[in-house]
């Protein structure tokens, strides 16, 4: 099984280009099922979850053509949904990726029927699908859960309705939003997720002919249309990848510019990096972080839905706090079981105490390289970051988690001066 070996001690310097957002491209690819003509998606990242989604679309009968493109242009995909003949998302594909549930709304709205296996993915808590089911039921769907499958049908077109989410759910908002686009009448979604990836999905749907207002706010209003046509959409840059590289620069005392970024989607993260002592400069599509010659200061944070601090950056900031000056307190309010990286960071010499959903991190003068194991996507990134500042070699096992959400991370870090390699 492949591993990544990081030799610590190098400050990162240079420029890195950010890939398309994992959490935007997956729902957007699923949204192509709503159209009755080919849809081109550009700035598509090379990720294992994207490959899985393409396999799922192909399993349903869609034709997917991939253009690898260039570094400047990025990768693009042309999805032709006109050949879709199946409305069942099988366990074999869904078990590896929770985002597979995002075909439920589009298939139901377009074909009046859908069967999707209960999802898998990272083992970081229950992440219930009830928000998806309740929202689609509000639009008139008949839904049951049998033999590990969510089975949904509708009698004719779905009907627009007002639905209030019990809790903020990003994928729940996306699934119900996609279904509402082809529903009859007006749908109002209250307590909707405000994440930039939801807004990007809405922008894609609008480009195909949908009528949506309020994406990026807690209240989204959808005027249903009878059909979506073809079109083109470029996926927004990945704010979590952006944040990960900025934290890497801050931890190593370096200076890095991230290009093809969207600074306005990262306010909470940039605020914490500034609090840690970094000097940050932004343009419309780039962020420069300068931490040369300085040790970061510990920061305390609480994860919460956007625009607050993102749970997907929690592990990276825990790694930063491991070598920062002072004590940082991290409260995780989104997912249970999202401190699984703590035991691995302890192996490197970190000083972390966990009390329920809170982790108290006391900065150490130094970490020491050791064999560690990735437990989920963002945990794997935190172990790489810790390895960048640890003495000696850190060997990270089970890096297949990493490939679900980071495109060519070892090449990108290597170009910034890190000593990092993938081994068979």
Curated annotation (Swiss-Prot):
Question: Which residues does the record give as phosphoenolpyruvate binding sites?
Answer: 22-23
Q: What residues bind UDP-N-acetyl-alpha-D-glucosamine, as annotated?
A: 98, 127-131, 312, 334
Instruction: Give the matching Gene3D superfamilies.
Output: Enolpyruvate transferase domain
Catalytic reactions of this protein = phosphoenolpyruvate + UDP-N-acetyl-alpha-D-glucosamine = UDP-N-acetyl-3-O-(1-carboxyvinyl)-alpha-D-glucosamine + phosphate
Active-site residues, record numbering mapped to chain: 122 (proton donor)
Query: Which biological process annotations from GO are given for this protein?
Result: cell division; cell wall organization; peptidoglycan biosynthetic process; regulation of cell shape; UDP-N-acetylgalactosamine biosynthetic process
2-(S-cysteinyl)pyruvic acid O-phosphothioketal PTM positions: 122
**Gene Ontology cellular component terms for the protein in this record:** cytoplasm
Please give the Gene Ontology molecular function terms for this protein: UDP-N-acetylglucosamine 1-carboxyvinyltransferase activity
**What pathway does this protein act in?**
Cell wall biogenesis; peptidoglycan biosynthesis
EC number of the protein: 2.5.1.7
Q: Please provide the record's keywords in A-Z order.
A: Cell cycle, Cell division, Cell shape, Cell wall biogenesis/degradation, Cytoplasm, Peptidoglycan synthesis, Pyruvate, Transferase
Q: Where in the cell is it found?
A: Cytoplasm
Q: Which family does it belong to?
A: Belongs to the EPSP synthase family. MurA subfamily.
Described by its record, this protein's role is as follows:
Cell wall formation. Adds enolpyruvyl to UDP-N-acetylglucosamine.
- Name under which the protein is recorded: UDP-N-acetylglucosamine 1-carboxyvinyltransferase
Q: Which organism is it from?
A: Xanthomonas axonopodis pv. citri (strain 306)
Phylogenetic lineage: Bacteria, Pseudomonadati, Pseudomonadota, Gammaproteobacteria, Lysobacterales
